[in-house]
Amino acid sequence: MTAIIDIVGREILDSRGNPTVEVDVVLEDGSFGRAAVPSGASTGAHEAVELRDGGSRYLGKGVEKAVEAVNGKIFDAIAGMDAESQLLIDQTMIELDGSANKGNIGANAILGVSLAVAKAAAQATGLPLYRYVGGANAHVLPVPMMNIINGGAHADNPIDFQEFMILPVGASSVREAVRYGSEVFHTLKKRLKDAGHNTNVGDEGGFAPNLKNAQAALDFIMESIEKAGFKPGEDIALGLDCAATEFFKDGNYVYEGERKTRDPKAQAKYLAKLASDYPIVTIEDGMAEDDWEGWKYLTDLIGDKCQLVGDDLFVTNSARLRDGIRMGVANSILVKVNQIGSLSETLDAVETAHKAGYTAVMSHRSGETEDSTIADLAVATNCGQIKTGSLARSDRTAKYNQLIRIEEELGKQARYAGRNALKFL
């Protein structure tokens, strides 16, 4: 009854207007699953590879080759398989690709099928996706990391850090957390406008004002939190995504906006000072993806009092994560389904992190769609934290809205992670 009888891949557009892969999977009993694949702007060198067409069509970014793989090789390989055999299906596709980075048939092709299979199987069993994937104990609603000021590769402004985030740790529910975020977001918009700044939004829905440095961005956010009636650090904490690989050049961190250069130790000390001066509880990619010594220095410096998240460092890859665990580097992993390219490997990365005492943060990409799968996966894994952008743009709010629905559906079983999501609070 849960045998796969049809798979249809198609080319659709993501939130940046670039092509991406969408996949429909149909089972023998008529159950149906659909998944759309996200895409990043600042991508780690060690990520699984999206298959793009090249040439002039869509300026080289077309995904017809990946769609062809879905409708051809992948369908031929997994047609008739039981959709509930997720691991076997994912392994079959990985072996079909045959490369270390999924570059032959494309991580975007494999992931689209992997997620659509899980959704179809969930429908066949009569369970919501978070319950199907996570089992009976899936009940923790994640604290959102809301990206309200954008810089770096996500915006055209002088700020070198990529994201400045708020975390509503003091809220009592995800519904309240979304309200906290929305009120701060709109307060920030007014304050930026009153100060003469542009209030257009970046790729992830946050504002992209021309501010001179990170401190200026953090000051605006702190003022907006207070003006909205909340207490910084108590109701709402702060987070950074430095995306440091983007400005790591010849062994140093080159801040073009500030016209400063910091060596790895100076970079770590700068981040430590920011975390001391502001209620910053999480820093993502504070060091570059291959600056293992810098990461170790940063972890030794503030790893006992701040969440240090590896994104480009770990790329949702259990093998790289195990290297980091062994070296005592970072204390958290960012989880992006398209970095590794299959649901099974994504779940394995979360499990590896939790076993080692590392936290895990479920995450979107800057190029998103209306697909809200990551909201379900955040609850399924009880990871307690989610990064899915700002409080604007429907490609971002779709995930918040899904979390609100899940919380409502869980009723009294639902538990908002709140301050418990971060061991340092």
From Swiss-Prot:
<keyword id="KW-0964">Secreted</keyword>
<keyword id="KW-0460">Magnesium</keyword>
<dbReference type="InterPro" id="IPR036849">
    <property type="entry name" value="Enolase-like_C_sf"/>
</dbReference>
<protein>
    <recommendedName>
        <fullName>Enolase</fullName>
        <ecNumber>4.2.1.11</ecNumber>
    </recommendedName>
</protein>
<dbReference type="Pfam" id="PF00113">
    <property type="entry name" value="Enolase_C"/>
</dbReference>
<feature type="binding site">
    <location>
        <position position="284"/>
    </location>
    <ligand>
        <name>Mg(2+)</name>
    </ligand>
</feature>
<dbReference type="InterPro" id="IPR020811">
    <property type="entry name" value="Enolase_N"/>
</dbReference>
<keyword id="KW-0963">Cytoplasm</keyword>
<dbReference type="GO" id="GO:0000015">
    <property type="term" value="C:phosphopyruvate hydratase complex"/>
</dbReference>
<feature type="binding site">
    <location>
        <position position="241"/>
    </location>
    <ligand>
        <name>Mg(2+)</name>
    </ligand>
</feature>
<comment type="pathway">
    <text>Carbohydrate degradation; glycolysis; pyruvate from D-glyceraldehyde 3-phosphate: step 4/5.</text>
</comment>
<keyword id="KW-0479">Metal-binding</keyword>
<feature type="binding site">
    <location>
        <position position="366"/>
    </location>
    <ligand>
        <name>(2R)-2-phosphoglycerate</name>
    </ligand>
</feature>
<dbReference type="GO" id="GO:0004634">
    <property type="term" value="F:phosphopyruvate hydratase activity"/>
</dbReference>
<dbReference type="GO" id="GO:0006096">
    <property type="term" value="P:glycolytic process"/>
</dbReference>
<dbReference type="GO" id="GO:0005576">
    <property type="term" value="C:extracellular region"/>
</dbReference>
<keyword id="KW-0324">Glycolysis</keyword>
<feature type="active site" description="Proton donor">
    <location>
        <position position="204"/>
    </location>
</feature>
<dbReference type="InterPro" id="IPR020810">
    <property type="entry name" value="Enolase_C"/>
</dbReference>
<keyword id="KW-0456">Lyase</keyword>
<dbReference type="InterPro" id="IPR029017">
    <property type="entry name" value="Enolase-like_N"/>
</dbReference>
<feature type="binding site">
    <location>
        <position position="387"/>
    </location>
    <ligand>
        <name>(2R)-2-phosphoglycerate</name>
    </ligand>
</feature>
<feature type="active site" description="Proton acceptor">
    <location>
        <position position="336"/>
    </location>
</feature>
<feature type="binding site">
    <location>
        <position position="311"/>
    </location>
    <ligand>
        <name>Mg(2+)</name>
    </ligand>
</feature>
<dbReference type="GO" id="GO:0000287">
    <property type="term" value="F:magnesium ion binding"/>
</dbReference>
<feature type="binding site">
    <location>
        <position position="162"/>
    </location>
    <ligand>
        <name>(2R)-2-phosphoglycerate</name>
    </ligand>
</feature>
<dbReference type="InterPro" id="IPR000941">
    <property type="entry name" value="Enolase"/>
</dbReference>
<comment type="function">
    <text>Catalyzes the reversible conversion of 2-phosphoglycerate (2-PG) into phosphoenolpyruvate (PEP). It is essential for the degradation of carbohydrates via glycolysis.</text>
</comment>
<dbReference type="InterPro" id="IPR020809">
    <property type="entry name" value="Enolase_CS"/>
</dbReference>
<feature type="binding site">
    <location>
        <position position="336"/>
    </location>
    <ligand>
        <name>(2R)-2-phosphoglycerate</name>
    </ligand>
</feature>
<dbReference type="GO" id="GO:0009986">
    <property type="term" value="C:cell surface"/>
</dbReference>
<feature type="binding site">
    <location>
        <position position="365"/>
    </location>
    <ligand>
        <name>(2R)-2-phosphoglycerate</name>
    </ligand>
</feature>
<dbReference type="Pfam" id="PF03952">
    <property type="entry name" value="Enolase_N"/>
</dbReference>
<comment type="similarity">
    <text>Belongs to the enolase family.</text>
</comment>
